[in-house]
Curated annotation (Swiss-Prot):
This protein's record includes keyword Transmembrane: yes
CDD domains: Arl6IP1
InterPro entries (alphabetical): ER_autophagy_membrane_reg
Cytoplasmic compartment segments: 1-41, 87-133
Coiled-coil features, chain-numbered ranges: none
Keyword Lipoprotein: no
Entry note about domains: The transmembrane domains are required for its ability to shape the endoplasmic reticulum membrane into tubules.
Subunit structure: Homooligomer. Heterodimer with ARL6IP5. Interacts with ATL1, TMEM33 and ARL6.
Domain of life: Eukaryota
Annotated protein name in UniProt: ADP-ribosylation factor-like protein 6-interacting protein 1
Length: 203
């Protein structure tokens, strides 16, 4: 057991080090984005919503086709991938990194690796379910996809995408400030109250 844990830890450390090396040119930008997403200042949440709203308003006004939209998005990613490693050191000054910044960059890369591992783990579980319980897999997939299709039919595509993107960008800050755990705790307490009331009525 201990040997397996050590092997997993070593593999995680190796993957994290590899990712750090790949993203070294994005280090300054990632640290700045991390501060924004974790709401280190009070005006960061409205700034996030304002920028996202502006981008989606531009998309709504231009109304590009799917092919044009995908092409522009990929072109933007290619430009960012080329320009950011060149311009970031000149703007932020990578030589001025502190130990705290280096540690935070390591934590960000480690969290990204863990998130990727979770996604791969869920994907493998899905295929395991398909092999071991094909009927349950089939019903789960049909019901889930039907629900997603119904939501997509009821809500405009652009509005739905806007809500998803905004929620994902606000999620780290909500988690950092304990807002998610707070409301989950409130929901659990309310559910427990309802269950206790139901038990009393049955008695």
């Amino acid at each position: 057991m201990a040997e397996g844990d050590n092997r997993s830890s070593n593999l995680l450390a190796a993957e994290t080090a590899s990712l750090e090396e790949q993203l070294q040119g994005w280090g300054e930008v990632m640290l700045m984005a991390d501060k924004v997403l974790r709401w280190e200042r009070a005006w960061f949440p409205p700034a996030i919503m304002g920028v996202v709203s502006l981008v989606f308003l531009i998309i709504y006004y231009l109304d590009p086709s799917v092919l044009s939209g995908v092409s522009c998005f990929v072109m933007f990613l290619c430009l960012a991938d080329y320009l950011v490693p060149i311009l970031a050191p000149r703007i932020f000054g990578s030589n001025k990194w502190t130990t705290e910044q280096q540690q935070r960059f390591h934590e960000i890369c480690s969290n990204l690796v863990k998130t990727r591992r979770r996604a791969v783990g869920w994907w493998k579980r899905l295929f395991t379910l398909k092999e071991e319980k094909p009927k349950m897999y089939f019903m789960t997939m049909i019901v889930s996809l039907a629900a997603v299709a119904w939501v997509g039919q009821q809500v405009h595509n652009l509005l739905l995408t806007y809500l998803i993107v905004t929620s994902l960008l606000l999620l780290p800050g909500l988690n950092q400030h304990g807002i998610i755990s707070k409301y989950i705790g409130m929901a659990k307490r309310e559910i427990n109250k309802l269950l206790k009331q139901k038990e009393k009525k049955n008695e």
